[in-house]
C-alpha cells in the first residue's frame, strides 16, 4: 500500500547509493535509481523499497513492481533480476531507518497554537466541545460530536453522526458514519513493533492507517494501533468493549464482538460474526474463521475454522477443553477411601 500523504509528509526521495551509504548495505543495482516510497515486498509499487527476511528455504511473495529490497545473504537468490538489492544482516532495521528518512507522521510535526486548524473542514451541524483539537486537513461530518479535549489528528476523517468521547485521540485514521468511540480511546498510535538490531531493541516506525467502518462501537480506553504498511481494519457493526487492545495490521470482519480486556496481536484475521469473550488473547498472525466463539480467558495460538467454539489456554475445541477440566478436577479431588 502506498503511504497516505494525508497522514505522512514526504521528506524527499533518495537514490540507492544514498540509501546504501546511510544503512551500510552492499548495493547490487543502479546507484542513481530513485526511491520515494516504502512498502511490503508483496505490495510494493514502482520507486518503492521493501525488505525480505527468512531462512533461505521458502520463496517470499514479491511484487513485480518492486524497485529495491533490503535482504540478508541467505535470501538473495530469491530476488528477481532488475530489482535493486541492498544486502545487510538486518534488513528490517535498515528498512525502518530509511522509512523514517522518507516520511514523517504529520501529527508529530508543528501545527501552530490554534485548537481547531483553519485548514480543517467541519460541517456546520457538527459539535466540537471545549478543548478539542482538530488538525489541518481533518474533516468532521454532519451531526458528528467531538468530545471535550479529544484530539483529531491531521488528515483524519470523521463520518456523519459519529461520536468521539472526551479525551479520545485519533491519528492516521478514516472513521465511518454512526461510529461511537468512547472516552479515552486511542486510535492510530504506533503499534508494538520491536526490532532487535546491533544496538539492541528498537521501535519500528508505522506508516499504515486505521480504517473504522460504519456503525462500529469502540469502548473507553481501548487502543487500536495503525498498520505498519497495510491498514488495521475494523469491520462494519463490530463492537469492541472497554480496555481492549487491537494491534497493528489486524483485520476484524463485520459484526465481530470483543469483550473487555481482549488482546489481539499483530496481523490477526477474525471473520464475520465471531465472538471473543472477556480477556481473550490471540497470538500474532492467527486466522479465525466466521462465526467462531472463544470462551472467556481463552489463549489462542492456532487457526480456527468457521463455526467452531474454543476455550482454554492453549485454546482448543470446547468439548475437549471441558473434558480436560473435568479430568483435572477429578484428579485434584479424589474420593476418600474407607
Curated annotation (Swiss-Prot):
CDD domains per record: LbH_LpxD
Record flagged with keyword Cell wall biogenesis/degradation: no
Keywords attached to this entry: Acyltransferase, Lipid A biosynthesis, Lipid biosynthesis, Lipid metabolism, Repeat, Transferase
Superkingdom, natural source: Bacteria
GO molecular function: N-acyltransferase activity
Keyword Acyltransferase carried by entry: yes
Active site, UniProt feature: 248
Catalytic activity: a UDP-3-O-[(3R)-3-hydroxyacyl]-alpha-D-glucosamine + a (3R)-hydroxyacyl-[ACP] = a UDP-2-N,3-O-bis[(3R)-3-hydroxyacyl]-alpha-D-glucosamine + holo-[ACP] + H(+)
GO CC annotation terms, alphabetical: membrane
One annotated GO biological process: lipid A biosynthetic process
InterPro entries in UniProt: Hexapep, Hexapep_transf_CS, LpxD, Trimer_LpxA-like_sf
Documented EC number(s): 2.3.1.191
Pathway participation: Bacterial outer membrane biogenesis; LPS lipid A biosynthesis
Complex and partners: Homotrimer.
The protein's role, per its UniProt record: Catalyzes the N-acylation of UDP-3-O-acylglucosamine using 3-hydroxyacyl-ACP as the acyl donor. Is involved in the biosynthesis of lipid A, a phosphorylated glycolipid that anchors the lipopolysaccharide to the outer membrane of the cell.
Family affiliation: Belongs to the transferase hexapeptide repeat family. LpxD subfamily.
HAMAP family the UniProt entry points to: LpxD
Name of the protein in question: UDP-3-O-acylglucosamine N-acyltransferase
Naturally occurring in which organism (per UniProt): Hyphomonas neptunium (strain ATCC 15444)
Gene name of this polypeptide: lpxD
